[in-house]
Design a protein with these regions (language model features):
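Catalytic "switch" loops of ABC-type ATPases
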Residues: 7-12, 118
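Conserved ABC ATPase signature
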Residues: 55-59, 63
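Conserved ABC ATPase "signature" region
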Residues: 26, 33-51, 103
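Hydrophobic anchor residue at the start of the ABC signature
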Residues: 5, 69
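Catalytic Walker B motif of ABC-type/P-loop ATPase nucleotide-binding domains
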Residues: 80-83
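A short, proline-enriched helix->beta-strand linker immediately N-terminal to the Walker B motif
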Residues: 74-78
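Helical segment within the ABC ATPase nucleotide-binding domain
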Residues: 94-109
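Short coil-to-helix segment of the ABC ATPase nucleotide-binding domain corresponding to the Q-loop/switch region
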Residues: 15-22
Length: 190
């Protein structure tokens, strides 16, 4: 099974924040009381504990994104797909949530696929970065990320981190140059 966090938060507007986060556990057959307790703990980890009884429309976009993060991470699934998960967050919150997610990924053994355009996020969170071209689904480079765990805020200060970011950037630049010469998928190559 796979949990998905789409770019939009997709929160249920008539449920409280806590019940939105608990929803996947309840749908999987868990007791509502236990699911709500786990949801509250996840919300506390994202500095949203005091907003657990609020409705989604009472939160900022960044807060709703963090609620969606908590819900996705509590979903009982063997794999997780995060589509631009940090897009709605300001720079400071983005760094905090990235550190929070890095901690969770270090603790869990679930396969996690993160779709992002942010090289720093990819290098901090991934074990492997797959560089894709403008042609959908075409992988042009695979870069192993050999950074120590756990990967918190200090990771972004390591020389190796910056070297890996440069390597990913070079791969993206080379991919972009190749794609421009190849044309778009709809163009004829006669």
């Amino acid at each position: 099974s796979c949990a998905l966090m789409p770019q939009s938060d997709s929160l249920v507007p008539w449920l409280s924040v806590r019940d939105n986060v608990a929803l996947p556990l309840v749908l999987a057959g868990g007791l509502k009381r236990d699911a709500r307790a786990q949801a509250q703990e996840a919300l506390e980890g994202l500095a949203l504990g005091s907003f657990s009884s609020h409705r989604p429309d009472e939160l900022s976009g960044g807060m709703r994104a963090r609620v969606a993060f908590a819900r996705t991470m509590l979903t009982p699934a063997s794999a997780i797909l995060l589509d631009e998960p940090f897009g709605a967050l300001d720079a400071l919150t983005r760094a905090d949530v990235c550190d929070w997610l890095a901690g969770i990924l270090d603790e869990e053994s679930r396969t996690t696929i993160i779709v992002t355009h942010d090289i720093r996020e990819a290098v901090q969170l991934a074990d492997t970065v797959h560089v894709m071209s403008a042609r959908p689904g075409h992988i042009t480079d695979i870069i192993p990320i050999d950074l120590p765990h756990p990967r918190g805020r200090g990771t972004r200060r390591l020389e190796r981190f910056h070297a890996l970011c440069a390597r990913v950037e070079d791969a993206l630049t080379n991919t972009h140059a190749r794609t421009e010469h190849e044309g778009t998928p709809c163009q004829s190559h006669e």
